[in-house]
Amino acid sequence: MAAAPIELVASYWTLAGNVMPGGPTEASPHPLRDRAEAAGKAGWKGLGIVHGDVLASIRHYGIPTIRRILEDNALVHNEVEVLTKWHRDGAKLATSNQMRDELLDFGAAICARNLKVTAGLFEEGPPDMPKFRDRFADLCERAAPYGIQVVVEFMPFSSVDTVDLALELVENGLANGGLMVDIWHVDRRDQYDKVKTIPLSLLKGVELNDASANVAGTLLHDSTHHRKLCGEGDLKIRSFIQDVLDVGYTGPWGVEIISHAVRTMPLEEAARRVYETTMSQFGEIRQADAA
């Protein structure tokens, strides 16, 4: 059979406009309809939507209209982002559980592919792995009836910051649990050699972007303001893509460009340029035939 087509998902911050993670608001200044139309026109096959924008879009459109907007623009690989503090207790857990339920309800309504989650964001020291594993299993169990995958992102500013730790967290979970592997996080923790060790059953999603070899300020500052369009930085994008394909991955590819330069671009220009520069990275990639 022919190789699987390359289909791209615009992770939320890529087309959100002039907002940023942890800002005063995370809801996009661009209405969801505008983002969806710009994405569809450029060739994207899915969007990510964060919790704050989920709530704002529901208030503005209602869920039936949101579903129709996504369908009309051929956006089929959609994601809900990003759940934090699900391993905590008390008031923090209660807040996380409310967000979880709202993201899963919305994700079910739009047939979302993934619920993205962090693991120990901004926490230092070794993670309480038994607790993480138990809570993750519960997340997967709650998401499974909706057909939603729960995907963990290891990050260099989280307690779960490597491929090995992330695999330890998810490896005994349900079938809908696994990893979202972002090349920026891979690079900043020098995890390139670990990518091929990820079992295909646990490789649920991949995100592409680029960056300079040198970190600008702190890791968090660099991640939030200085990611680059694919091919305009120093990350090992093509070899990373090849390693992911060699594992056997055939799913859609997320693109997460969190960048001052991109967030201040006109929406249609951002949709087009990010799409084109990302697709250009696949030009000389060797793909196995789809099973």
Outline where the language-model segments fall.
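Short beta-strand segments at enzyme active-site cores
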Residues: G46-V50, N78-E81, R113-A119, V150-E153, ...
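Acidic/histidine-rich catalytic cores of soluble enzymes
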Residues: E7, G46-L47, N78, D138-D234, ...
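Active-site groove signature of glycoside hydrolases
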Residues: G107-P127, Y146, V151-P156
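Distinct, well-ordered alpha-helical segments
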Residues: R59-I66, A91-S96, P127-R133, S158-G177, ...
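N-terminal pre-domain/capping segments
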Residues: M1-A108, A144, L174, G178, ...
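Surface-exposed, active-site-proximal loop segments in enzymatic domains
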Residues: M20, L55-G62, L83-M99, A119-K131, ...
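A short, acidic, flexible beta-alpha connecting loop/helix-capping segment that sits on the rim
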Residues: G254-E269
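Active-site beta-loop-alpha junctions enriched in small/polar residues
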Residues: W13-L15, V50-V54, V82-K85, G120-F122, ...
